[in-house]
Every structure is written in C-alpha cells, then in structure tokens.
Amino acid sequence: EHIVVIPASGGKIRVESVNKQYGHPEYRGIFEIDLVDKALHIINELPLEEYLYSVVPSEMPTEYQKEALKAQAVCARSYAIKQMAGKRLAALGAHVDDSVSFQVYNNLREDAASIAAVNETKGQVVFAENQVAETYFYSVSAGVSAGIKEVWFAKKDRSYLMPCVLLGDSRKTLDLQKEADFSEFLQGEIKSYDTNSPWYRWRTTVSEKQLQQFISEKIKSRYEKNPTQIQTKQKDGTFFSTGQTELGEIKKVE
C-alpha cells in the first residue's frame, strides 16, 4: 500500500519515532510511504531550495559568517543537482539519502541564517568543464587535499579536484617522505586554513590488537567489494589478489 502524507498549507511533518541532533525532526514537503520488507520506506519530496534549508545547518554551523554559509549553499546545491542526475537511488524512488553517504539533511534544524544563505544564492551552482561541478567538500583539512582519483577512485582527473597544499605560506608542494619531516608536519606549528579547528591536529591511542582487528575488518570489507584493490606482495616483488584478508605482523611501512 502506498501512502502520501500532505501537511496543511505551510505545515511540516514531524516524525516522533526518529531522533536527530535537535530532537524529533520536522520536514517540509510531503511524505511518500511504502511497506518494504516489513519496514516503512519513507521518501520526503520537496523543492530543492527547501531541501537546502536543512542541509546547510547540518553541514556547517550557522554561527559562521554569512558569506561562508552562502558558499556552503552553492556547494550543496551543486552537489545535489549532480546526484539527482546520477540517479544512484533511482531503484528506491529517491535522489539522495539524508546521511554522509550524500550530504547530511535535517540533522540540525533550519534557521534564519541557513534560509537566508539559500535564498540569497537561489539557483547558483559551481560550473566547470562545461557542466555542473562535483563539489565534494569536507569538514577539516589537515593542510593538504587529495585528488578525486585518490579519494573516489574516479577513472579520470578533474581539473578542479586535484591534490594541493593548503598552507598559509607560499609552499606549493610538501616532501614528507622522511619520518622526521612528516612528524614535524603533524606536530609543528603549521599554519593552514583550518588551524583553529579542534580537529586540525588530534591524538588518540589504540592497542596493537585493536588496530590489527580494525584494519583486518576493513581489508576484508574492501576485498568483498572489489578483490582487485587488495593485493599481496609476492616474493618476486609483484602484487597479486590472493584473497588474504587477515593482517599479519607489520614489518615495514613504506
């Protein structure tokens, strides 16, 4: 059975069985509800601009400066349009989900600042290489960025998604091949765009057993998805996908 929930004019739909960071979430637009595998499958259908009202505060604190919020709105709009065209969730009747698998939606309540940022950039997108750009974004940079091939395993580079140094000086490259240089990069007073973020540099401690278990689980998961990405070094120096997913003792890091 297919159910459509349409709120009264100007109203929102509140889902009391779900908890977000701000409590029970409220949604603009309409709900389409289906029973799938004995669970409710809910799609929230609403205009793109109204969707962005609740994406911007979920991805960036609305206490930030207005121009930063507007930039986030443009990136979020561009990303959403690109995902709509990609049709990754077409089988489910949706364009995106509300998690970090796409971009976070309605984890924090929309407010005047997020609405203004969206309204004042209405219809604006990032355009590159004769199409809407793939505006991937992240919360904190360690001082460098990676390219689209390294992060998303893209088949070809994007001129606007190349690895680059994001430091507050004139350096365009970094040589971190030596352990001492890498240690200085992590522990020294390195100024960058995100220097003031609490996650710019951080420290944690795990046991050897925990680390081995964690890495083994990730290797197994990645192997199950794409065996060619997990290869074992042979005695002759070549690499081959053997199905070995258990992590042995680490002897050397290159």
Give the ranges of each region predicted by the language model:
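Conserved, single-site charged/polar hotspot
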Residues: E1-E254
